[in-house]
């Protein structure tokens, strides 16, 4: 009703931007007359004007005033460098981002290009801008591709990659605009706050940040905190024994109700992802291990057994993890990518290693941690882009104070979303998927099939191989990951079939007919790798292995001949045609030149990738080799383009890309992302989901209602079921899951909020120490506070002065400050409490000056170094112990709910007390260490 009366709030919001769009369009003609150098000068003038304003509010107003001109400059630069002009809707997207909101833009609407607008504008402050992507490949692609626009305008562009040294990182963070992944940014922040020298700190204070695929980072990954950990030795045989025991235990067929244990040794709750021993199971374990109590603190077993049971029942090989180089590597459930270097905590990873008979790595202890939620809230300006934000609008608003605005598409969507097909059994569903894939493939349309795990993608792969359908597989297996971009680049070719796990290639558009730019790069890579790359540099050839060797170009032979008559017989599985002799000769000359200049097999694969990517740019270059490479790339691309343009036309005629979903994801948003692959930028396309009543989502969250439906449907397994009740069950299951995970994220956020305030206090204290501004005053401050606390502890103001325990107080003071050895009770017994505090603080300052003169005689500057060392040492040690204590508190506090107490309030109160105690200990330990500090001198060494 309100919508009818007031109109759609999103539409009202968009109208507000229209006059600014008109102003930018008006400026376009004026800006287009400027030379390249004049454009750069405009940037310089704007930057000088904005960065010189020290008042933050005034600076923000200046930025807003400069927006039309800045956007017009970026649009012009983009036309000149990328041959891409921002549409009006993209300008609106840029304004939404500048206002620190989330811009929801459909797949293929050019989100990456939109980001150039607010990034350029906010970089004019000179405080740095971060562009965040979900993986290293996308960060590099965007820094190379969009970075051209910024470099052309005279701004510096940085890129953070996994294997960079601290020096390289610092240099890149100091650039005007820096591209990085969320995990690199987060870990650098934690490492900076563990460094012992200000020169080791790589990041500047945060300013403005744009997150690409914001839903993936702020929502999907919000449940997992970033943790830096150190190793702790734990007995490995316990993991092995627990793993053997888990195999011997019998799972209960159902979950116990009303406190009554079911038949079996343990029950599994898939929804809560937990395993609980029954009384019978406890007895069996105690007998097997010959112990009387699994929870005995001196010899605990319960934790090991629970982890072993979870490894057996809930952590499935090729779904949750894969085995690579004799290590268990985690697979991200949202992107389907492997996450090397990441490990499950609390001994869970070790339990999986024991289950798979791998070498068990030592357990770890947390040294520093932060959640993505609290990390990104450190940015004064935060904005994000995604194709799907509306489903999580409330969470963005509540947790991050971020509004979502839907940006209209530039062209009308022509995608057809076909009704779901639901099957009784999983095998019936997979057969139907294979049938539909074969049918669409034979019609000459490209097909993209999204699966939820490595295991399922390989099952479908084998079904298609039986049907002799050539296809590409894109999942977390190492041999497929390397070819991610290559596979997606050709996924739009006629009849191509691509199976992808959770659309791992998000970020690379599927272009109907195939992506000539990527194919040209790959052709050059194929020629140059054997000549330029070091032989020991591990690399798989980038040529996708089609599953059917007889077919050409990803088509069945019949389709290949019908659709692509102009493609010669000798086309390979990736490249659309053979290059003519003239181009081949040129490539041969190029190879010889590059070997002469870059050396025979001297580069790494990454180096070569970078150089080919630079050559693919349009940015000006003086490098002769890059120019040669660019010319060859252009020739190869033009050659491929001729064939692919014809192919694109054919693909459009038969209906465009068809996307098949094989399971509803836990989040409707991920389903929408998969659908969004078809029908980009007004292309034709279609989507359909195939589901079964045995799918995880319905099985775990659908409840008894779905189980009853299964029995009610007396239909064959390969007969699709259509039922309104079923569709409603499905939607309610999905909403249930979304609410369930939202509650988990909310809880993670609320608990981490307590840690966050403590973390900020500790990290700002550390930074003060690293910057070294007046360390002496800081340490004396610690000492004065300690003297104050000693007086408060030993003097009771309610007692008369003659009953005060002055002797005990003086003894305590001397424990901390041995230089006050001649201090006597008689010196202070006539003083009031305030006078006593002032007197002791005065004595402390005098003693500290004396200590300083002793130390400085040994070596000037040594006292400041000692102060820095002891403060950092104490902060780090006590913070590490505090993190451990807070973890234990969090685990135990949940039980207080049974005593009618709010666990979160209890956690806040006790956590605060523990934090105050930690800070007190830190101050006292520093004072004690400083006075006890006795450096060795040359005389000591001679003696």
From Swiss-Prot:
Q: Main role?
A: Part of the Sec protein translocase complex. Interacts with the SecYEG preprotein conducting channel. Has a central role in coupling the hydrolysis of ATP to the transfer of proteins into and across the cell membrane, serving as an ATP-driven molecular motor driving the stepwise translocation of polypeptide chains across the membrane.
- Localization terms from the record: Cell inner membrane; Cellular thylakoid membrane; Cytoplasm
Q: What is this protein called?
A: Protein translocase subunit SecA
Spell out the NCBIfam families in the cross-references.
Answer: secA (TIGR00963)
Where is the secretion signal located?
none
State the residue spans of region: Disordered. 535-560
Q: What coarse category fits the chief subcellular location reported for this protein? A: membrane
SMART domains on file: SecA_DEAD (SM00957), SecA_PP_bind (SM00958)
State whether it acts alone or in a complex, and with which partners, per the record. Monomer and homodimer. Part of the essential Sec protein translocation apparatus which comprises SecA, SecYEG and auxiliary proteins SecDF. Other proteins may also be involved.
What organism is the protein native to? Answer: Prochlorococcus marinus (strain MIT 9312)
- Indicate which residues the UniProt annotation says bind ATP: 90, 108-112, 509
- UniProt keyword annotations, A-Z: ATP-binding, Cell inner membrane, Cell membrane, Cytoplasm, Membrane, Nucleotide-binding, Protein transport, Thylakoid, Translocase, Translocation, Transport
Concerning InterPro entries, the annotation shows: Helicase_ATP-bd, P-loop_NTPase, SecA, SecA_CS, SecA_DEAD, SecA_motor_DEAD, SecA_preprotein_X-link_dom, SecA_SF2_C
Q: Which GO terms describe its molecular function?
A: ATP binding; protein-exporting ATPase activity
Provide the catalytic activity annotation.
Answer: ATP + H2O + cellular proteinSide 1 = ADP + phosphate + cellular proteinSide 2
The protein's Enzyme Commission number: 7.4.2.8
Concerning its family, UniProt says:
Belongs to the SecA family.
Q: Name one GO biological process term.
A: intracellular protein transmembrane transport
Q: Where is the composition biased (Low complexity)?
A: 551-560
Q: One GO term of the cellular component aspect?
A: cytosol
Group of enzyme by EC: translocase
């Amino acid at each position: 009703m309100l919508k009818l009366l007031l109109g759609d709030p999103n539409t009202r919001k968009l109208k507000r931007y229209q006059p600014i769009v008109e102003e930018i369009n008006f400026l376009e003609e004026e800006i287009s007359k400027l030379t390249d150098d004049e454009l750069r000068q405009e940037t310089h003038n704007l930057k000088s004007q904005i960065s010189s304003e020290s008042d933050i509010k005034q600076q923000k107003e200046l930025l807003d005033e400069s927006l039309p001109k800045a956007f017009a400059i970026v649009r012009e630069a983009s036309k000149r460098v990328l041959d891409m002009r921002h549409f009006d809707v993209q300008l609106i997207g840029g304004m939404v981002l500048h206002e620190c909101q989330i811009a929801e833009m459909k797949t293929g609407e050019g989100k990456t290009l939109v980001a150039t607008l607010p990034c350029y504008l906010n970089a004019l402050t000179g405080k740095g801008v971060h562009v965040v992507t979900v993986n290293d490949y996308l960060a590099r692609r965007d820094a190379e591709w969009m970075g051209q626009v910024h470099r052309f305008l005279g701004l510096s562009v940085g890129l953070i990659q996994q294997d960079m040294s601290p020096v390289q990182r610092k240099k890149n963070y100091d650039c005007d605009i820096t591209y990085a992944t969320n995990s690199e940014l987060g870990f650098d922040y934690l490492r900076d706050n563990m460094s012992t020298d200000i020169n080791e700190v790589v990041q500047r204070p945060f300013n403005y940040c744009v997150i690409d695929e914001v839903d993936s980072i702020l929502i999907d990954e919000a449940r997992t905190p970033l943790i830096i950990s150190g190793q702790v030795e734990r007995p490995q045989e316990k993991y092995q024994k627990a793993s053997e025991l888990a195999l011997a235990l019998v799972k209960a067929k159902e979950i116990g109700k009303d406190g009554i244990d079911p038949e079996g040794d343990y029950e599994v709750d898939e929804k809560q992802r937990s395993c609980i021993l029954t009384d019978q199971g406890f007895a069996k374990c105690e007998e097997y291990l010959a112990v009387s109590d699994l929870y005995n603190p001196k010899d605990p077993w319960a934790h090991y057994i629970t982890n072993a049971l979870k490894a057996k029942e809930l952590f499935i090989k090729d779904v949750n993890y894969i085995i690579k180089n004799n290590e268990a590597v985690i697979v991200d459930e949202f992107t389907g990518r492997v996450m090397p270097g990441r490990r499950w905590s609390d001994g869970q990873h070790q339990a999986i290693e024991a289950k798979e008979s791998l070498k068990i790595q030592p357990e770890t202890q947390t040294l520093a941690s932060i959640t993505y939620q609290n990390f990104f809230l450190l940015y004064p300006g935060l904005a994000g882009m995604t194709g799907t934000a509306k489903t999580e609008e409330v969470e963005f608003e509540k947790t991050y104070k971020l509004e979502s605005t839907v940006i209209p598409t530039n062209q009308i969507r022509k995608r057809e979303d076909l009704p779901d097909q639901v099957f009784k059994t999983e095998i019936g569903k997979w057969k139907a998927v294979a049938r539909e894939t074969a049918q669409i493939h034979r019609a000459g349309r490209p097909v993209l099939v999204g699966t939820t795990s490595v295991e399922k993608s390989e099952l479908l792969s084998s079904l298609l191989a039986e049907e002799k359908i050539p296809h590409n597989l894109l999942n977390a297996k190492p041999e497929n990951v390397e070819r991610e971009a290559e596979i997606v680049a050709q996924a739009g070719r006629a009849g191509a079939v691509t199976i992808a796990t959770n659309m791992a290639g998000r970020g690379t558009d599927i272009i109907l007919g195939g992506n000539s730019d990527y194919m040209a790069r790959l052709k050059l890579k194929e020629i140059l790798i054997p000549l330029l790359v070091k032989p020991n540099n591990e690399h798989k050839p980038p040529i996708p292995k089609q599953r059917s060797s007889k077919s050409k170009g990803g088509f069945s032979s019949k389709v290949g001949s019908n659709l692509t008559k102009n493609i010669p017989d000798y086309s390979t599985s990736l490249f659309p045609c053979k290059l003519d002799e003239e181009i081949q000769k040129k490539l041969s000359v190029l190879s010889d030149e590059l070997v002469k200049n870059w050396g025979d097999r001297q580069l790494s694969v990454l180096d070569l990738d970078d150089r080919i990517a630079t050559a693919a740019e349009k940015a000006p270059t003086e490098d002769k080799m890059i120019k040669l490479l660019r010319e060859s790339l252009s020739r190869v691309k033009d050659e491929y383009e001729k064939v692919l343009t014809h192919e694109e036309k054919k693909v459009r005629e038969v209906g465009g890309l068809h996307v098949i979903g094989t399971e509803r994801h836990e989040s409707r948003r991920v389903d929408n992302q998969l659908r969004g692959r078809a029908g980009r930028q007004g292309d034709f396309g279609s989507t359909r989901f195939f589901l079964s009543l045995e799918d995880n989502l319905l099985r775990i969250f659908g409840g008894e209602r779905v189980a009853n439906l299964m029995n009610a449907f007396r239909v064959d397994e390969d007969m699709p079921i259509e039922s309104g009740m079923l569709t409603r069950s499905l939607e309610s299951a999905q909403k249930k899951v979304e609410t369930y995970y939202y509650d988990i994220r909310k809880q993670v956020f609320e608990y981490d909020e307590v840690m966050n305030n403590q973390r900020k206090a500790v990290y700002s204290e550390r930074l003060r120490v690293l910057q070294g501004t007046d360390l002496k005053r800081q340490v004396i401050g610690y000492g004065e506070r300690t003297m104050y606390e000693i007086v408060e502890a030993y003097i009771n103001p309610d007692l008369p002065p003659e009953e005060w325990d002055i002797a005990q107080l003086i003894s305590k003071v001397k424990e901390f400050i041995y230089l006050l050895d001649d201090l006597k009770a008689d010196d202070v017994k006539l003083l009031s409490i305030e006078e006593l505090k002032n007197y002791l603080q005065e004595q402390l300052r005098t003693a500290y000056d004396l200590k300083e003169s002793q130390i400085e005689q040994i070596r000037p500057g040594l006292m400041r170094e000692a102060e820095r060392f002891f403060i950092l040492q104490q902060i780090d040690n006590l913070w590490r112990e505090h993190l451990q204590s807070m973890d234990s508190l969090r685990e135990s506090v949940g039980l207080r709910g049974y005593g009618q107490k709010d666990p979160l309030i209890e956690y806040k109160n006790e956590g605060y007390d523990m934090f105050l105690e930690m800070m007190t200990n830190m101050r006292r330990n520093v004072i004690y260490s400083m006075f006890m500090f006795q450096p060795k001198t040359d005389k000591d060494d001679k003696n």
